[in-house]
A protein has these predicted regions:
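Cysteine-nucleophile amide-bond enzymes
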Residues: 1-174
Length: 175
């Protein structure tokens, strides 16, 4: 299909624009990565008050302080500042990064009650296995359209199981 390369380019341009910092964002309380690292266990969910244009759109649509979620997986390798968190990013897809990336963000930690250490590790390993998947921008757009009155909604986009948005990443990890 000849439109596919054009749509792919448009998606990359849109993702790059959405990933830019939101000049109006004010962080109420920045995270301390070292304190977080002492507190976190594999499988913990991090709610993030993001600082990008995309984050502003998500917060407006959801009427929430939190625009993003990620999962703490523990150090992926033995290097200092090794990636310890996995997220689905609008520009880069499912990726690993260090807690240091959240230094300028307000973060809240959520932990599933009743999971054993083995179950928490399984959640983390399941998320690590999805590294490299693309971001499902169409799914994100579909969720945004759900906020519109019924008569203003265009036809549905299909959800791509080979791609993820941050919330589906969390859901898949805990199934």
């Amino acid at each position: 299909m000849m439109l596919e390369p054009l749509l792919s380019s448009l998606q990359r341009i849109t993702a790059a624009w959405l990933s830019q910092p939101d000049p109006g964002h004010v962080c109420p309380r920045a995270a301390d990565p070292r304190a977080l690292e002492r507190l976190l266990e594999p499988g913990d969910v991090l709610l993030v008050d993001g600082d990008t244009r995309f984050a502003r759109i998500v917060k407006t649509m959801t009427r929430s302080t939190w625009s993003h979620v990620a999962i703490y997986v523990g150090p992926i390798n033995a290097e200092p500042d090794a990636p310890t968190v996995v997220e689905a990013d609008v520009k880069d897809g499912v990726r690993a990064l260090s807690l240091e990336q959240f230094r300028a963000c307000h973060v809240r930690v959520m932990r599933a009650v009743g999971l054993s250490a083995v179950e928490r590790r399984a959640v983390a390993d399941g998320v690590i296995a999805r590294l490299g998947q693309g971001y499902d921008l169409r799914h994100a757009i579909r969720l945004g359209r759900a906020q519109l009155p019924m008569r203003q909604r265009p036809t549905e986009f299909a959800v791509d199981p080979q791609r993820a948005i941050c919330s589906t990443q969390i859901g898949r990890a805990h199934v």
